[in-house]
């Protein structure tokens, strides 16, 4: 997913 590429995975 693009979210993981942007680093949103760290916000979760």
Swiss-Prot record:
Q: Which GO terms describe its cellular component?
A: extracellular region
The alphabetized UniProt keywords are: Amidation, Neuropeptide, Pyrrolidone carboxylic acid, Secreted
Keyword check for Secreted, yes or no.
yes
Q: Where in the cell is it found?
A: Secreted
- One GO BP annotation of this record: neuropeptide signaling pathway
List of residues that carry Arginine amide: 12
Residue(s) carrying Pyrrolidone carboxylic acid: 1
Q: What does this protein do?
A: Myoactive peptide. Increases the amplitude and frequency of spontaneous contractions and tonus of hindgut muscle.
User: What is the protein's given name?
Assistant: Tachykinin-related peptide 8
């Amino acid at each position: 997913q693009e979210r993981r590429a942007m680093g949103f995975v760290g916000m979760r």
